[in-house]
Amino acid sequence: MRWKLVFVCVFFVLTGSVLGNAHPQKFEKAEFYAVMKSATPDAINTELETIKDAPEKEREGYEGALLMRKAGLLKKPKDRLSFFKQGRIKLETALVADPDNAEFHFLRLIIQEHAPKIVKYHSDIEKDKALIIKSFKDLSPAVRHAILDYCENSKVLHKEDFS
């Protein structure tokens, strides 16, 4: 009887500590951009949970970008379109609320550059590029690093634009 009680207590202690560490503690921009770059649906789902710790005024933009990124990884066309539309609404809402936020313009540019033509989400690429270049020096180091990293595979942004 005693061993059963000890076993149950140890089990709950271990389970509680493992589950307690399952959720990331804090939103980090560097981690967000790492997930955006080499995303898997599971990594995106984890980051969507982490975004709940992001500042409220920025949460919609990050969440929208992740949902649109996730849409590109799904198999069913219906799911892809649904996630893309949800993400688009969130990101565009964030841009309307804060039209000078260069980071959100960068996120939109990433999505626009890789979006299929059928979703007709390419109209603001040049506008976003201009705002990103103009505001580059004012962005946080994590975002600047993400932009320069993105330039390596971009047809729109180039490292020379920021010299």
What is the meaning of each model-derived region?
Residues 37, 69-78, 114-119:
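Short coil/turn linking the two alpha-helices of tandem helical-hairpin repeats
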Residues 56, 101-102, 139:
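Residue-level recognition of tetratricopeptide repeat
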Residues 128-163:
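Terminal, low-structured helical/coil segments at or just beyond the last alpha-helical repeat
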Residues 34-48, 80-88, 121-122:
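Helix-turn-helix repeat elements of alpha-solenoid scaffolds
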